[in-house]
Amino acid sequence: MIVTVTANPSVDRTIGLPHALARGEVQRAVAVTAQPGGKGINVARVVHGAGLGTVAVLPAGAADPLLTQLAAVGLPHRAVSIDEPVRTNVTLAEPDGTTTKINEPGAELSAGDLARLTDLVAEAAADARWVALCGSLPPGVPADWYAEVTARLHAGGRRVAVDTSGPPLLAIAQARPDLLKPNAFELAELVGGDGARLEAAAAEGDLE
């Protein structure tokens, strides 16, 4: 069993445009899709598709469209109820493949919301081998929350993987998760250096 945690989930809407985006003009969409999003949910979707046990843990109100979408695709999930709606992220897709992304900050979690989410993660992880803490943290959540959750999970004998960036990445590194997944730019945040140079070196097979 792999439990995924998405503290800042989203409904991801993609709007297809008939031509290049023109600022300041009215443009009509040629296609619109919406699906549940957030890094942890995406990981759970892949794990579930591979036929392995998984459950996605997240904050969302009982009537939130995100939970309806998760149920529609048959993805196992457990949610802590919150008052604010889950954020909507919008991608504007042009015919040549160019995309413009607009991401909302997310629903603010109160101290009570966060405490209940932390408890639910620990409860869901009772039968798990791995817990994946994924994505950004929403407003109201301290940068060291992933580190706090990791310590609690380690105390229960669970293995923890983390995929995040910015201040939460810097904080979690000190908690020594079992797996940390930075890209080149995030690795540069941790160890210093130039992310673009690290990425170019990796692309060329130069790992020194």
For the regions a language model picked out, list residue spans one by one.
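Conserved phosphate/ATP/ADP-binding segment of small-molecule kinases
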Residues: 144-160, 164-208
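General beta-strand structural signal in soluble alpha/beta enzymes
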Residues: 5, 78-79, 132-133, 160-164, ...
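Glycine-rich phosphate/adenosyl-contacting loop at the front of the ribokinase-like
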Residues: 1-55
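Conserved N-terminal subdomain of the carbohydrate kinase-like
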Residues: 23, 48-129
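Cofactor-binding loop segments of dinucleotide-utilizing enzymes, especially the Rossmann-like FAD-
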Residues: 5-9, 59-61, 82, 136, ...
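Short acidic, glycine-rich surface-loop motifs adjacent to enzyme active sites
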Residues: 125-140
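Short, acidic/turn-prone active-site loops that include or flank metal/cofactor-
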Residues: 9, 30-33, 84, 105-107, ...
